Amino acid sequence: MDIFSEFLNCLSSDGTLNESSIYKTYQILESLNPKDVDTKENYIKLSNTFSTLGSGVGFQDNLLIEMFKILTVLFFKTRSTDLGDLLIESFTSLEIEKLMRVKKTIGSIVLTKGIQELQEIELPKVGFNCMTYDESIFQGISLERLILQLMSIFIAKCEENKLWLVNNRKDLDLRVIGQRLLHRDFACRFLSGLFISRFSVSGDTDESKHQNGIRLQLFIDFSKFETRLTMQILKADRIFSTCVANTVHAYEGLFSSGSNIDSTIATLVLEPRDLIVYRKGFALLQIPWTSVTTIDKIKKVKSLKIITEVSSLDEFVFQCKDGDKFDELFSTSEEIMNKLLPAIIVSPKLTLRNRSIIQIKEGESKLPNTSKQASQNLPHLDDELAYQRFEDQVIDKSVCDDECTNTENTPSSNIPADVKDSLSADDYAYDTKRKTQIEDLEEDQNKSKIASKDGTNLKEINSVPEFSDENVINQTGPAKKTPVQRRKDGKFAKSTKRKKQKSLKPDTENQESSVKNKKAKSNVNLQYSPKTPICKINDETLKPPTIANIAGHKQMNHLTSENIETPVPVPNGNWYNGVKHETATDIFTTCHDGNNSLKSSVWKELLKEKHWKQESKPQLTGNSRQIDLSTFVKQANTPNITSLLDGTCSSPPNNECFNDKEPDSSSSTLISDRQELEYRNPNAETVKLEEIPYNKFFKTVEKNEAYNPSSKSATIDGLQRYTSMIGNQIYEGILQNEKELRSKLEAYHINCNKVIKEFSKRQTARYKIIEKELAQIEVNLVSQIDSLMFK
């Protein structure tokens, strides 16, 4: 122990480390007591040294290799997850040449000790439906993750280590790695499959398949699997899909973070101590539940916004693909968080201490009984997907913290099974605290208002979610819930408002007047209403709503508190300018309504009302939506983008368009009507416009009378249909231009971020080199001054 203490003192005091002292320290490591080594002070000294050891500056190659040997032995000796993380971080930060040199030198030590540790660790005897881990079980799972991850790093692109492991297969039990394919933990299953797949031979020939089968037998006992495994199944994408098939709480959807504008296809897996996000072409994201601070539910787009304390990922949004599983996803995550956090009692006087709260606006949602039996069969998957980027990437190093409390050892574990099922998550986990909390609640219910430090009064709370009165719940009218807000005195308050429903009576007067006045009825038909037939806009170019970079975007049109359950802005994207897809009416309509439409004049109404000069938005009729093209501007990420429709309706139509006559005395605007007439009368070869009475289409104009389009114009059948087609093309052009601008902006931001990151890396490396050189110069100056003083 004295030699090891001297070694640590040299590290902390920047003393000279020679090869002999390092070699002596390495020799006595096996005889040390793990409890004496695994202390906070020793970890601080080691982390300060190995955090700068990754740059490799100031260390020779032989000393660098010996230092990593010492850290490797310390990790397997103490089984400390902190030392394991330090080993992986410092090793992966080395330069490529030094990394490969260290990998080839100490690879045999890492593989030998890793397999020996996996032999001693037993698989947890818990089922796939279990969503709680004992602390000892979780410590073993965390250690297995680190060992498999470290072994996978030393195998990647290193044929020497692969050959050494195969040659020593008789001394090492390689099948302990294949046993992890049946592990309860998702990450262990994924890492074991990734490790085995690195031994595969590329190619589709019979010889390559034969070699893959032989190598697969080294790691897997086929008698424990009902289906035949192949190397192709254990590839990165394929093994992930196989692991998801054996996972109960796995959900597919779209993932987007604050730094990424576009959403990527991802799969979210809920584990008892952490949640895992997998995106094709990226490394796994492992986020411990203890670092999750807030979960907001967006019911409108079936999404969850999760805010974390992880520095690299402050927040992200996951949109569930299957709407039926969204409630299960939300309730499962709520149940897991309730087991990790202390009980929350919602009362008129809220005092919540010591931990952060999940702000959930969807009321009390319980975990549905939708758990399925885990399938032991590995399913046959589709064609193998190309996966190149994942070869050098392994599971993310941000594994679960150890701050989780042991919920299975609570006194409530003695409750019978039938009673547990009837209790909620909070009642089940915190049954022993109810008596004191109910007493405090009875005292607090006598107070109707709470005064904060600044003198402001909170509104009266009419209902309590956990201790509610039936008379309060049965009140008429929907309850408008406000989110949990923090007061200035550091406490929380929650209020509930109720609005009485207004009695809606049918507007019989307007209906009678519209029936009596035929002209008014024709005007009503021109407006937008749910009964008006609409022409569908082509949805092929429109994407579904995506959860993109929503910071800085404007709020959507007609966004109310009823459409969204949490104070989260709805993502902006190519989605009808933020309008709900289910209830959004199209921009253009047609007014084919029998004989009534024939008696009205479209041009008359257009010239009379002059929609192109109106600055205010038109009035809405009922629940319909009306958009004026002259003021319509598509929202976009880039500001100050003018609409392409400005100027298209700047002036009314000229009279010349009505006076241009063809030889058959028909207006040039009625050419499309001829085609419709020919289509409607298939028996006649050609239908001339003179053969049809004029009173069906337009009124007779006297020869000596001047033509006044405002009073006597033709009612054109199908005009709105062609107008809508033109508008649709304009709208699609706007969307296409916006896509191009957005893609250019995204590429520009990505390039800027890359340049900034590379510059910061270069600067930090330069500063480290300068600091080391200054330290050496200082030491030399001090030594020279001492020598001069002695002389």
From Swiss-Prot:
GO terms for biological process: meiotic DNA double-strand break formation; reciprocal meiotic recombination. It comes from the Eukaryota. One of its GO terms (cellular component) is linear element. A motif (Nuclear localization signal) lies at residues 485-492. Keywords: Chromosome, Meiosis, Nucleus. It is found in: Nucleus; Chromosome. Residues 493-503 have a biased composition (Basic residues). Residues 644-657 have a biased composition (Polar residues). The keyword Iron does not apply. Its main location: nucleus. Disruption phenotype: Abnormal linear element formation. Abolishes localization of hop1 to meiotic chromosomal axis sites and DNA double-strand break (DSB) hotspots. Severely decreases localization of rec15 to chromosomal axis sites. Abnormal sporulation. The keyword tRNA processing does not apply. Residues 462-523, 644-672 are annotated as: Disordered. Pfam families: Red1. Component of linear elements (LinEs), which are similar to synaptonemal complexes, at least composed of rec27, rec25, rec10 and mug20. Interacts with rec25; the interaction is direct. Interacts with hop1 (via N-terminus); the interaction is direct. Interacts with rec15 (via C-terminus); the interaction is direct. Organizes linear element components on chromosomes and is thus required for meiotic DNA recombination. This is Linear element protein rec10. It comes from Schizosaccharomyces pombe (strain 972 / ATCC 24843). The gene is rec10.
